[in-house]
Structures are given as C-alpha cells and as structure tokens.
C-alpha cells in the first residue's frame, strides 16, 4: 500500500477534506498497481516563491510549478520503501483551475496522481509514447478516485460540486 508519511503546511481551508481525499488517492493508486508492500512518500505544500526556487535548483526551470516530484529511486542502486517527496503549490493549482475552467479539487487530485507517477519513474517528457502511457494511467486513477470519493459525504461545498 502506498501511504503518505508526512504532510507539511496544508492550507487550513482544505485540510479536513484533503486528508480524506489523500487516503482515497493512496488506496486507488495502490490498487491500480497492485502494491503489496508498504511504500511511503512525503507531501509538502509550498509557496509560489518556494516552487520557483525548487524548480530552478532541481530541474533548471525558471517558472512556478504546480507540482514537483523528487524521486529517490531514480538511478538508485538500492530500492527503499521511501519513494520520494512531492511539493505542491496550491496557489498555482488554484490559478490553473481558473485558467482552464476546471474545479480546484479535480486539478489537485490530478496533480498529486501525476506526482506519484513521477515517483514511480513514469516520465511523460521522454517521448510521445511515454506521455500517452503516463497520461492514460493518470486519467484511469483520477477516475477511480472521483468514483470512490462520490460515495463519501463532504462538508466542503466546492468538493461536493466536483463529486456531483
């Protein structure tokens, strides 16, 4: 089972619902890949400034990223139960949700799954074929998460609108 082991700086406005959504993401992701061992990742919310700094230092890219994954398995001699760390810029995701006219929660779920795929070394930037496979798997898991989450009762009205 894939589990987050540490959450840092979750914005208070989404904290309660976010914990539930994250459990569903972990369950659906683990189920999709038939993960039997305990694997872990760290998830941290960062500011736009921190996202820019991380993207610059880790990826040599000069823009605010919605999500940055740091895979500990990449080129590793030893595989550990710790997959890596995911940095989320919720302000960037909120801006993108408005820009692309999609729900914030949908985009947040999609980006976390995208980040988890990167931790498993799925790299959509490698080729068109890798991009197709990665994004297909991503959408399959997103759909499972939404379907599972629809069965839950949420207090957050925005989240209720996402789940229909």
UniProtKB/Swiss-Prot annotation:
Primary localization class, coarse: cytoplasm
Residues that hold Zn(2+) according to the record: 114, 118, 124
InterPro entries, sorted: MetalPrtase_cat_dom_sf_prd, YbeY
GO biological process, one term: rRNA processing
Any one GO MF annotation of this record: zinc ion binding
Gene Ontology CC annotations of this record: cytoplasm
Enzyme class: hydrolase
Species annotation: Mycoplasmoides gallisepticum (strain R(low / passage 15 / clone 2)) (Mycoplasma gallisepticum)
Gene3D superfamilies named in the record: Metalloproteases ('zincins'), catalytic domain (3.40.390.30)
Documented EC number(s): 3.1.-.-
Free-text function comment from the UniProt entry: Single strand-specific metallo-endoribonuclease involved in late-stage 70S ribosome quality control and in maturation of the 3' terminus of the 16S rRNA.
Listed name of the protein: Endoribonuclease YbeY
Note describing how the cofactor binds: Binds 1 zinc ion.
Cofactor(s) recorded in Swiss-Prot or TrEMBL: Zn(2+)
Family statement: Belongs to the endoribonuclease YbeY family.
Subcellular location: Cytoplasm
Keywords assigned: Cytoplasm, Endonuclease, Hydrolase, Metal-binding, Nuclease, Ribosome biogenesis, rRNA processing, Zinc
A Pfam family assignment: YbeY
